[in-house]
């Protein structure tokens, strides 16, 4: 079954420990350093819209883009109470096309790693560049190859009321892809329903992504550790990138 099909309906409960506010706060710190004050933004691979909603509540006009219709359904439901909710669009990132330019593009929670073909990743970054206004900024994070390799052979459990998930990691050195076989159990009344999804992430290196950003035309490329300023440390599990489009002087 496709990734984020059945999982979409339990995703927020299984990830209730994710601090989206802290992630957006780090974006804001980066933008403050770069002198960017966005009025418009796109949240790439937005999932159930948690980051998009935080940005929208700050008065930013937001578009959320994701490949999963089920995740976008949940995002729309969460946005119903907002006076100016994000607009949500179902698109693959390598075919990203927005009706107008934006000042900020973000891609949270290692979602870029889900692009399994490096050529598609390169094209996605080009599309992001074209979607940004001059002086705009692109901020995203990825899992490091070290982290994805460490997942090989590991078994993980996540649970909340009425939902239970067990997943197993397997890293393939030939393809550079980490696969997660995920068994999901969701309860409806007295009945438990089981489904299976496979999630995969490509282990992009820091140099590889830096090259893609440069080739797309980005400048002022910076790489940070996990929600902290300063270069990534040895063994870092997540790193952040920020890059600018043609700063207007």
PLM features: residue spans?
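SAM-dependent methyltransferase
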Residues: 139-210
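A short glycine-rich, Lys/Arg-flanked "PGG" loop and its adjoining helix->strand segment in the class I
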Residues: 122-134
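Class I SAM-dependent methyltransferase SAM/SAH-binding core
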Residues: 42, 49-95
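Residues lining the SAM
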Residues: 108-110
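Conserved class I S-adenosyl-L-methionine
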Residues: 1-37
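A short acidic, Gly/Pro-enriched loop at the edge of an enzyme's catalytic core
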Residues: 97-104
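A short His-aromatic
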Residues: 113-115
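C-terminal lobe and adjacent flexible extensions of AdoMet/dcAdoMet transferase-like proteins
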Residues: 202, 206-249
């Amino acid at each position: 079954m496709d990734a984020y099909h059945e999982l979409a309906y339990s995703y927020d409960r299984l990830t209730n420990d994710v601090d989206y506010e802290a992630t957006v706060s780090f974006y804001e710190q980066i933008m403050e350093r770069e002198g960017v004050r966005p009025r418009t933004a796109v949240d790439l691979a937005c999932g159930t819209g948690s980051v998009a909603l935080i940005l929208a509540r700050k008065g930013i006009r937001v578009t959320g883009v994701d490949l999963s219709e089920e995740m976008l359904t949940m995002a729309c439901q969460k946005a119903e109470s907002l006076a100016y909710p994000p607009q949500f669009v179902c698109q693959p990132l390598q075919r990203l096309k927005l009706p107008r330019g934006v000042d900020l593009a973000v891609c949270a929670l290692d979602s870029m790693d889900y692009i399994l073909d490096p050529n598609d990743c390169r094209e996605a970054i080009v599309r992001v560049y074209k979607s940004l206004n001059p002086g705009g900024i692109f901020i995203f994070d990825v899992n490091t190859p070290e982290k994805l390799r460490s997942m090989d052979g590991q078994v993980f459990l996540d649970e909340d009321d009425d939902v239970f998930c067990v997943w197993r990691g397997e890293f393939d050195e030939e393809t550079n892809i980490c696969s997660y076989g995920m068994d999901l159990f969701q309860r409806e009344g007295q009945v438990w329903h089981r489904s299976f999804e496979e999630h995969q992430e490509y282990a992009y290196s820091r140099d590889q992504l830096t090259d893609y950003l440069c080739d797309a035309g980005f400048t002022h490329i910076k790489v940070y550790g996990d929600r902290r300023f300063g270069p990534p440390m040895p063994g870092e599990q997540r790193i952040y990138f920020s890059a600018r489009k043609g700063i207007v002087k």
